[in-house]
């Protein structure tokens, strides 16, 4: 776990992110307010501020690999890894990776889903930061954490753009150190 003192100042990134997230009502189903990050992605300066904040976090944690969770986590993990000079590991939906994989099921609102990672994705002891767009219920993050630990990784944390606090996802991430740029 990291101390509060070692965390980068995320206030600038939070302000930029807040100005570049659009609420989409009733998507993907009635009653849901979807947080759309495409305005952030389409504004290079704003995207750069947010990626820079995530890269600063990764550096501070000593991450040598960045793991991105399908699909929007890929959009963040790749530029963060590039800025840090780290490798990138994709954590994908079931059936999307060739070769030998590890699998982890997690609960959805109705049913289950499965995430996969290559068996040889990270060497034992590799310092990995998981990156995703949103922490909601915590199921996806917990599954990603389990997969990486199963490969022998030293998972240094989870970094997300937004944390939907009303869903209590942080409670399901166990010992995983979570950093969110913005809490909703």
From Swiss-Prot:
Q: Which GO terms describe its molecular function?
A: adenine binding; adenine phosphoribosyltransferase activity; AMP binding
- Which chemical reaction does it catalyze? AMP + diphosphate = 5-phospho-alpha-D-ribose 1-diphosphate + adenine
Task: Extract the InterPro entries matched here.
Answer: Ade_phspho_trans, PRibTrfase_dom, PRTase-like, UPRTase/APRTase
Q: Which cell locations does it reside in? A: Cytoplasm
Give GO BP annotations, semicolon-separated.
adenine salvage; AMP salvage; purine ribonucleoside salvage
The answer to whether the entry has keyword Iron is: no
Cite the HAMAP family for this sequence. Answer: Aden_phosphoribosyltr
Which family does the record claim for this protein? Answer: Belongs to the purine/pyrimidine phosphoribosyltransferase family.
- Subunit arrangement? Homodimer.
Describe the function of this protein.
Catalyzes a salvage reaction resulting in the formation of AMP, that is energically less costly than de novo synthesis.
Indicate what this protein is called per its UniProt record: Adenine phosphoribosyltransferase
Query: Which species is listed as the source?
Result: Parafrankia sp. (strain EAN1pec)
Gene behind the chain: apt
């Amino acid at each position: 776990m990291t101390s509060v003192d070692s965390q980068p100042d995320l206030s600038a990134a939070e302000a930029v992110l807040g100005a570049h997230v659009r609420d989409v009502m009733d998507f993907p189903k009635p009653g849901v307010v979807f947080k759309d990050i495409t305005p952030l992605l389409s504004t290079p300066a704003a995207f750069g501020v947010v990626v820079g904040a995530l890269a600063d976090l990764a550096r501070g944690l000593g991450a040598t690999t960045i793991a991105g969770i399908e699909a929007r986590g890929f959009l963040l993990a790749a530029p963060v890894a590039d800025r840090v000079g780290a490798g990138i590991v994709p954590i994908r939906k079931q059936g999307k990776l060739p070769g030998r994989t590890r699998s982890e099921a997690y609960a959805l609102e109705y049913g289950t889903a499965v995430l996969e990672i290559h068996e040889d994705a990270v060497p034992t002891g590799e310092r990995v930061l998981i990156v995703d767009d949103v922490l909601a219920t915590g199921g996806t993050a917990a599954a990603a954490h389990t997969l990486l630990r199963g490969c022998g990784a030293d998972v240094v944390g989870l970094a997300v753009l937004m944390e939907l606090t009303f869903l209590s996802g942080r409670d399901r991430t166990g010992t995983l150190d979570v950093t969110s740029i913005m809490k909703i």
